[in-house]
Amino acid sequence: MAKVRILIFTLVLFFSLNVHIHGFYLPGVAPQDFQMGDALMVKVNKLTSTKTQLPYSYYSLPYCRPEHIVDSAENLGEVLRGDRIENSPFVFKMRESQMCAAVCRVKLDKKTAKAFKEKIADEYRVNMILDNLPLVVPVQRPDQDNVVVYQHGFHVGLKGIFAGKKEEKYFIHNHLTFTVRYHRDIQTDSSRIVGFEVKPFSVKHEYEGQWNEKARLTTCDPHTKRAVTNSESPQEVEEGNEIIFTYDVDFQESEVKWASRWDTYLLMADDQIHWFSIVNSMMIVLFLSGMVAMIMLRTLYRDISNYNQLESHEEALEETGWKLVHGDVFRPPTNPELLCVYAGTGVQCFGMILVTMIFACLGFLSPSNRGGLMTAMLLLWVFMGLLAGYASSRLYKTLRGTEWKRNALKTAFMFPATVFVAFFVLNAIIWGQKSSGAVPFGTMFALVVLWFGISVPLVFIGGYIGFRKPAPEDPVKTNKIPRQIPTQAWYMNPIFSILIGGILPFGAVFIELFFILTSIWLHQFYYIFGFLFIVFIILIITCAEITVVLCYFQLCSEDYQWWWRSYLTSGSSAVYLFLYAVFYFYTKLEITKLVSAVLYFGYMLIVSYVFFVFTGAIGFYACFWFTRLIYSSVKID
């Protein structure tokens, strides 16, 4: 009867709340309706290159400019990504196609010609935005018929041999054929933009008479319906040449609705690979789960039963294995404060990644919310300082520490300071290259304010709460005199077992890691957080189980120094992550500049460091729970 009343109350509460529920859109991603003839303002973003990894502002090149350049408001994530979104002279009218619209004429001097040549040689791409949709170039996949993939932006130009000449020349894409796809509402006749594509061409424009804004081009003419369809007579980049920038825009009605407009961009042709990755990782998990089950259900049960049935202390001493180290297994490790700091920081990383994954799977961090992912991760990291302080102080008190303020101070500064110094050095390198990817001083100051103003106080609050709580009691008493550790077999060597322990966690994620690195360094879309969340769960289970198994073998060999080894065992997967990053650099990337290589390895070192702290904490807490569980079941006289 009580359950029925609870059910009725729940239903009444639900329907009463449901009356006040209204749908909403995330800021900046709400649909915008356009009537025929409404102005469509195209915005320009950074110039990007996979060869240099150094973004530059669109107007760092002498492109056509509007009368006044206006910077768009950007969130923290966009600034850190190097986005520089500005207005442009490209203005369309909704559902009104244009042909051969002249934007401006630019005469190249030595400096501007050199700037264009450098960007063309480094294969820079121009990025634009219309109604929050990025500009893409549709390209047919050579290995699959009727499969089109979309590339971010269009190349500034191309380099090659033309008209039988022996020397390589530089040619600029000065004519853009835009295609704007829209979905029309029949009832209101309003339209929503669902696609923004371009085909770039290099055309040496010609005109009659003197140049002015209304000069009639002979190479493309809307009056005679002469359109640009190829680059048979390309525009060469050379000092003294004049370049006329033009564009066409064609509006095409589409059946794709606004809510589904990103599906085309995010369509993955590699789903089978992701499923293979998950199945492969699940096999690893099942194998490790079988080993853990065997240890817990057979070996431990038998050992504990036999141990508890021994009649005398002398008989207990004759036993070998993990039971003999019960008087030393909870002896505090060397440098316990550092272990507490890293354990607490690992909990902070875990909380940040977990909540970010949940938000991403719910769609809050979609690509339409540009910069949202990085902004969310930073803010979550700051607020998870509460968990870091709490976890660190709880462990610190368990290890009989007394200076909780010093421990909290180290937790608040050690890991963030290391990452911040590395980030500051890399940012200085980017600044030296005059790249727009350099984080401005104001943003850097905002990061410091978030760190000192929010994260550090939260770490101390968490530390205070954690230290006030009584420390969990050890299941067994610790002997006053440490037990001598016998000579270990070669396969139980700490370095060997630690490195072996990191292979399986890395094996669970390395296929997904390939797609993540590709999205970051080759500027491709990544929005398969469903797959990633499954892999994330598999990684947690794998880290926990492999560390528990190796910890059990270590205790069976009468080595009770498991504290640091448990952290390093799963954390060593970060070593393999960095080695894979090196492999990826030499096999997939075409980076040629030393500065770009330094940036790549610098950022991958930071990522590997975060991965080490995150996976290390998982393995450590798994062993912390495991040792307390098995030794609490042993009867000690």
UniProtKB/Swiss-Prot annotation:
<feature type="topological domain" description="Cytoplasmic">
    <location>
        <begin position="615"/>
        <end position="637"/>
    </location>
</feature>
<feature type="transmembrane region" description="Helical; Name=3">
    <location>
        <begin position="371"/>
        <end position="391"/>
    </location>
</feature>
<keyword id="KW-0732">Signal</keyword>
<feature type="transmembrane region" description="Helical; Name=8">
    <location>
        <begin position="567"/>
        <end position="587"/>
    </location>
</feature>
<feature type="topological domain" description="Cytoplasmic">
    <location>
        <begin position="392"/>
        <end position="411"/>
    </location>
</feature>
<feature type="transmembrane region" description="Helical; Name=1">
    <location>
        <begin position="275"/>
        <end position="295"/>
    </location>
</feature>
<protein>
    <recommendedName>
        <fullName>Transmembrane 9 superfamily member 10</fullName>
    </recommendedName>
</protein>
<feature type="topological domain" description="Lumenal">
    <location>
        <begin position="24"/>
        <end position="274"/>
    </location>
</feature>
<feature type="short sequence motif" description="Golgi retention signal">
    <location>
        <begin position="635"/>
        <end position="637"/>
    </location>
</feature>
<dbReference type="Pfam" id="PF02990">
    <property type="entry name" value="EMP70"/>
</dbReference>
<feature type="transmembrane region" description="Helical; Name=5">
    <location>
        <begin position="445"/>
        <end position="465"/>
    </location>
</feature>
<keyword id="KW-0812">Transmembrane</keyword>
<dbReference type="GO" id="GO:0005794">
    <property type="term" value="C:Golgi apparatus"/>
</dbReference>
<feature type="topological domain" description="Lumenal">
    <location>
        <begin position="588"/>
        <end position="593"/>
    </location>
</feature>
<keyword id="KW-1133">Transmembrane helix</keyword>
<keyword id="KW-0333">Golgi apparatus</keyword>
<feature type="transmembrane region" description="Helical; Name=7">
    <location>
        <begin position="528"/>
        <end position="548"/>
    </location>
</feature>
<comment type="similarity">
    <text>Belongs to the nonaspanin (TM9SF) (TC 9.A.2) family.</text>
</comment>
<feature type="signal peptide">
    <location>
        <begin position="1"/>
        <end position="23"/>
    </location>
</feature>
<feature type="transmembrane region" description="Helical; Name=9">
    <location>
        <begin position="594"/>
        <end position="614"/>
    </location>
</feature>
<feature type="topological domain" description="Cytoplasmic">
    <location>
        <begin position="549"/>
        <end position="566"/>
    </location>
</feature>
<feature type="topological domain" description="Cytoplasmic">
    <location>
        <begin position="296"/>
        <end position="344"/>
    </location>
</feature>
<dbReference type="GO" id="GO:0000139">
    <property type="term" value="C:Golgi membrane"/>
</dbReference>
<feature type="topological domain" description="Lumenal">
    <location>
        <begin position="433"/>
        <end position="444"/>
    </location>
</feature>
<feature type="transmembrane region" description="Helical; Name=2">
    <location>
        <begin position="345"/>
        <end position="365"/>
    </location>
</feature>
<dbReference type="InterPro" id="IPR004240">
    <property type="entry name" value="EMP70"/>
</dbReference>
<keyword id="KW-0472">Membrane</keyword>
<feature type="transmembrane region" description="Helical; Name=4">
    <location>
        <begin position="412"/>
        <end position="432"/>
    </location>
</feature>
<feature type="short sequence motif" description="Endoplasmic reticulum export signal">
    <location>
        <begin position="626"/>
        <end position="631"/>
    </location>
</feature>
<dbReference type="GO" id="GO:0010008">
    <property type="term" value="C:endosome membrane"/>
</dbReference>
<keyword id="KW-0967">Endosome</keyword>
<feature type="topological domain" description="Lumenal">
    <location>
        <begin position="366"/>
        <end position="370"/>
    </location>
</feature>
<feature type="topological domain" description="Lumenal">
    <location>
        <begin position="516"/>
        <end position="527"/>
    </location>
</feature>
<feature type="transmembrane region" description="Helical; Name=6">
    <location>
        <begin position="495"/>
        <end position="515"/>
    </location>
</feature>
<feature type="topological domain" description="Cytoplasmic">
    <location>
        <begin position="466"/>
        <end position="494"/>
    </location>
</feature>
